[in-house]
Amino acid sequence: MRTTHVVILPYDPKWNEDFSAIRAELEAAMGELALRIEHVRSTSVEGMSSKPCIDVDVVIPDRTCLKATIERLASIGYVHEGNLRIEGREAFCYTGKPHLQLHHLYVCPADSEELRRHITFREFLR
């Protein structure tokens, strides 16, 4: 289902807490496969208005880890959607996570240009 409108809210400090809860669940499932888990886009920028959706990048060593990553994320309710025509990142959707804030989850190899773009954009906004 696609939304027909966009909601922008004033900055909410809870977004960082929400990210921490999402990160904890991902870290528990991913273990050593996740080099790091990044909070990206506008909800990660203190004081910035944003859509109330947390954007998360899970960084893996390289594409050879993708199959194991997909399996581990599937074990906690995420479904791999492919790259959605954007090279350098893999998208995941989920159902049944009412305990977590609405979020977008992407998996990126450490050398991914898309990851670099996400981090650069976040740092520019900060």
Features from the language model and the residues they span:
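Helical scaffold of the NTase/Pol beta-like nucleotidyltransferase catalytic core
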Residues: M1-E38
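Short amphipathic alpha-helical segments
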Residues: T4-V6, P52-V56, Q101-H103, F121
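Active-site nucleotide-donor binding segment shared across nucleotidyl transfer reactions
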Residues: L26-K67
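Short glycine-aromatic motifs
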Residues: A34, G77-Y78
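Short amphipathic alpha-helices in soluble, non-transmembrane regions
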Residues: A68-I76
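Conserved catalytic core of two-metal-ion nucleotidyltransferases
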Residues: Y78-E113
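Catalytic cores of NTP-dependent nucleotidyl/adenyl transfer enzymes across multiple folds
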Residues: E114-R126
